[in-house]
């Protein structure tokens, strides 16, 4: 991923954490949690729309098995997201111990969401998706009250210039698809020789 695109998507991911892009936004959130989302939505839309798709030299077909286990927090998450934002989601994937079905007492909720282009069609859709994902982290915290991270977030545009350092493609091998598309293709740059064996 090019440096310019990488920085843009880092800011976009920061927005999805809590809407805050700077310290002033953090203070603003004390007045109401939605205010930073409202204030910064326009900035995020411009960043997304201005992010160019780079020419990449590797591609990989991804196919992920559907989630078959019946763990109550995973099912609660699926039901919540399907009800609230399913039309904005390309896919939701469980990885870590949830993906391999090797849960232990201290397991946390490791999950990736890939957001489609329609998330970034308007401020309203962007704010809706961002605040819904933030609220859904309550389900993660019910599984693990010490959960130290929320969602891993990617956008549909990033599938064309995949951020391998943020989410190594090898993690898909141990993931399960909770909802959405379980087959897609990613394109990525060589980074220190990483993933060259996946070229198709």
Role assignments for model-derived ranges:
Residues 78-109, 113-121:
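Active-site nucleotide-donor binding segment shared across nucleotidyl transfer reactions
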Residues 32-33, 73, 95, 117, ...:
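Histidine (H) residue identity feature
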């Amino acid at each position: 991923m090019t440096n310019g695109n990488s920085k843009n998507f880092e800011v976009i991911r920061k927005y999805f954490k809590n809407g805050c892009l700077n310290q002033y936004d953090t203070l603003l959130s004390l007045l109401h949690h939605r205010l930073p989302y409202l204030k910064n939505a326009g900035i995020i839309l411009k960043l997304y729309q201005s992010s160019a798709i780079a020419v990449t030299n590797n591609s990989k077909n991804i196919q992920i098995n559907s989630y078959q286990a019946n763990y109550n927090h995973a099912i609660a998450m699926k039901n919540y997201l399907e009800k609230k934002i399913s039309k904005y989601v390309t896919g939701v994937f469980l990885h870590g111990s949830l993906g391999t079905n090797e849960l232990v007492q201290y397991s946390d909720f490791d999950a990736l969401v890939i957001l489609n282009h329609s998330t970034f069609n308007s401020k309203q859709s962007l704010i809706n998706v961002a605040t819904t994902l933030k609220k859904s982290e309550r389900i993660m915290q019910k599984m693990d009250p010490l959960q130290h991270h929320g969602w891993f977030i990617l956008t549909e545009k990033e599938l064309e210039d995949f951020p391998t350092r943020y989410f190594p493609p090898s993690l898909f091998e141990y993931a399960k698809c909770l909802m959405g598309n379980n087959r897609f293709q990613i394109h990525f740059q060589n980074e220190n020789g990483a993933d060259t064996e996946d070229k198709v």
